[in-house]
Amino acid sequence: MEKFAPEFHGEDANNKATKFLESIKGKFASSKDPKKKDSIISVNSIDIEVTKESPITSGTNIINPISEADSTPEAKANYPRKPLDSFKEDLTPSDNPFSKLYKETIETFDNNEEESSYSYEEINDQTNDNITARLDRIDEKLSEILGMLHTLVVASAGPTSARDGIRDAMVGLREEMIEKIRAEALMTNDRLEAMARLRNEESEKMAKDTSDEVSLNPTSKKLSNLLEDNDSDNDLSLDDF
């Protein structure tokens, strides 16, 4: 059985506390003896004055006392200092990825096959290769639709709930692909019509500009005669202008 210290309450506890304080009062109230020499302990460059009668002298450990010899420059270790990293980088206009001109230049000259259907290059390109590329993409999308239909046929052999879910998903994808193909076809047709219209306009301009002759007005004719004949009688007057 463990023994516990007795508990005191009320007046009895007050009397016990008073007697205890009186018993230890003499230990801490003793005057300092001038004959006893005090010791000074230097702990981490902090001077602590400790008397010989002080209770903290027992079991006191001096941690890393600093001596005068260690404070010399030769005793200190020479550690190389790492330069600070700078997070500010001055980019040239050609290396700045946030530059609009740089981005447009890269997109123009980069042969990126994954371009959108309405890219800048395709809108301004009126060559036959561009139309052929669009038709190839339409054919690829039609092949994807055929593949989805084949998957739908294979999935129809499964359970009813799974078959219905797959069928609804495939039908939705098929409708979406059909709309995209229709938009591609309409855009391709519009481009073909625009190319034909521009070709006809250029043909009409070339038909009107078949003559290589240059006609001169009367004043230009007089100037031409003056230069050819070099005659003073053909001098121009203000009335000629």
Curated annotation (Swiss-Prot):
Keywords: Host cytoplasm, Host-virus interaction, Inhibition of host NF-kappa-B by virus, Phosphoprotein, Viral RNA replication, Virion. Constitutively phosphorylated by host. Phosphorylation at S-116, S-117, S-119, S-232 and S-237 is required for transcription inhibition by M2-2 and viral particle egress. Phosphorylation at S-232 and S-237 increases the affinity of the binding to the nucleoprotein. The modification Phosphothreonine is found at residue 108. GO terms for molecular function: RNA-directed RNA polymerase activity. The keyword ATP-binding does not apply. Residues 216-232 are annotated as: Binding to RNA-directed RNA polymerase L. Pfam families: Pneumo_phosprot. InterPro entries: EF_Hand_1_Ca_BS (IPR018247), Pprotein_pneumovir (IPR003487). Residues 90-110 are annotated as: Binding to protein M2-1. The modification Phosphoserine is found at residues 116-117, 119, 232, 237. Residues 228-241 have a biased composition (Acidic residues). The keyword Phosphoprotein applies. Its main location: virion. The record marks 108 as: Interaction with protein M2-1. Residues 39-57 are annotated as: Important for viral particle assembly. It is found in: Virion; Host cytoplasm. The N-terminus is important for viral particle assembly. The oligomerization region is central. The C-terminus part contains binding regions for the RNA-directed RNA polymerase L and the nucleoprotein. This is Phosphoprotein. It comes from Human respiratory syncytial virus B (strain 18537).
